[in-house]
Amino acid sequence: MKKIKLQELKDSEILEQLEEARKVLRTSRFQYGVARSLENPKVIHNTKKKIAKLLTIQRERQLKVNPGERKSRVLSRAKRKKKNLARLSAKVKG
């Protein structure tokens, strides 16, 4: 399924596709790792790519609904470090 077709899917259909792809990945990994009966190991790679595409589309839709969510979600490493240092110094003082 191409990305253009994936973009046209509804949210519920995307969730169904994700569920199905995860099942395929789980069974493929089992067949490859334990049973050694997987004919084409490339199936694992392609399924992982499909899952990533579906998750990307899902995230893009979330950002369209809440455009400010992205800014509040991501903190740079320096900001996290500064925040943790402030919290630790407050514990030492208090």
UniProtKB/Swiss-Prot annotation:
Biased amino acid composition, Basic residues: 73-94
Gene Ontology terms, MF aspect: structural constituent of ribosome
Region (Disordered): 66-94
GO biological process, one term: translation
Protein family according to the UniProt entry: Belongs to the universal ribosomal protein uL29 family.
Family annotation (NCBIfam families): L29 (TIGR00012)
Name of this chain's protein: Large ribosomal subunit protein uL29
